[in-house]
Amino acid sequence: FWDEGINEKIEFSNMSAGLKIFTVLQQLISNYSLKRGDVLIVDEPEVNLHPTWQITLAEILVRIYKELGIFILANSHSPYFIRAIEVKMAEYECALQGRYYFMKQDENAYISTDVTENTNEIYDALYQPLNLL
């Protein structure tokens, strides 16, 4: 990674955690490591990102899907990021292809429930801790 203000190469190990996701995505695309029809799995990609950058990341992921035909499987605990995905999917006219699942704890396991038609269940759960304050 190059910082124009410093004119020095910044080693990946010295980058902030938030910057690393953008760098990895850029490298995967520029190296042609991802091909149409591939599945990119990203685990909580919004971690260490300011909410504004979460929106930017959501748009990048939606564009990777829309323009490159690469499927994205992401999990998140961020209502900002999830909402940004919903909004950007609509903006890029691919909202009908998006699916949203919520993991619910049962007595012995977690059960995945499709909440695409009512994502409020996700937001209710994510905002629940605020009610404890």
What is the role of each PLM region?
Residues W2-N131:
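Switch/communication elements of ASCE P-loop NTPase nucleotide-binding domains
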